[in-house]
Curated annotation (Swiss-Prot):
Keywords: Ribonucleoprotein, Ribosomal protein, RNA-binding, rRNA-binding. Part of the ribosomal stalk of the 50S ribosomal subunit. The N-terminus interacts with L11 and the large rRNA to form the base of the stalk. The C-terminus forms an elongated spine to which L12 dimers bind in a sequential fashion forming a multimeric L10(L12)X complex. Forms part of the ribosomal stalk, playing a central role in the interaction of the ribosome with GTP-bound translation factors. Pfam families: Ribosomal_L10. This is Large ribosomal subunit protein uL10. InterPro entries: Ribosomal_uL10 (IPR001790), Ribosomal_uL10-like_sf (IPR043141), Ribosomal_uL10_bac (IPR022973), Ribosomal_uL10_bac_type (IPR047865). HAMAP family: Ribosomal_uL10. It comes from Chlamydia caviae (strain ATCC VR-813 / DSM 19441 / 03DC25 / GPIC). The keyword Transferase does not apply.
């Protein structure tokens, strides 16, 4: 291997080890403006998009001790390295993809120490986030409490109404 490729391989291996996960993508019809917009959207979730040579990426994966299915890797490939939360990065990729006519195809990924297929990464991206799940739980807990408060309030107003009617009779 040439020295440049060795340095690139080492850099990719470092990114793999530093990241919480990564998503392998095929990109279609990506202009420079799309690429810049995609990179900017990922910066908000502590992730970055890299266009890599297939051979370099798969060699880095192999050297890192991971296994990724490389059978469907035709076309231009890019990798999203997620440094904070890989699920948030996957959600961001899915949102960007919806806004830009499905120009990205999920091929594979590694999220929370699990090797995933492209369909599995996409399914994870469609799940509600932790924040959304917390909001749902709070809503479920708050609904019965507000009903109890309403019932107690109506019971108290009933008692007050009875007392008021008694005082008016006398």
């Amino acid at each position: 291997m040439k020295e440049e490729k060795k340095l690139l391989l080492q850099e990719v291996e470092e990114k793999i080890s530093a990241s919480q996960g990564f998503i392998l993508l095929r990109y279609l019809g990506f202009s420079a403006a799309y690429s810049r917009e995609f990179r900017n959207s990922l910066s908000g979730v502590s992730a970055e998009f890299e266009v890599l040579k297939k051979r370099i990426f798969f060699k880095a994966i192999e050297n890192s001790g991971f296994e990724i299915d490389s059978s469907d890797t035709g076309g231009h490939l890019g990798v999203v390295f997620a440094y904070d939360d890989a699920v948030s990065a996957a959600k961001q990729v899915l949102d960007f993809n919806k806004q830009h006519n499905d120009s990205l195809v999920f091929l594979a990924g590694r999220i929370d120490s699990a090797n995933l297929s492209g369909k599995e990464v996409e399914a994870v991206a469609k799940l509600p986030s932790m924040k959304e799940l917390r909001q749902q739980v709070v809503g479920l807990l708050a609904a019965p409490m507000s009903q109890v408060v309403g019932i107690m309030g109506s019971a108290l107003s009933g008692v007050i109404s009875c007392i008021d009617q008694k005082t008016q009779k006398n």
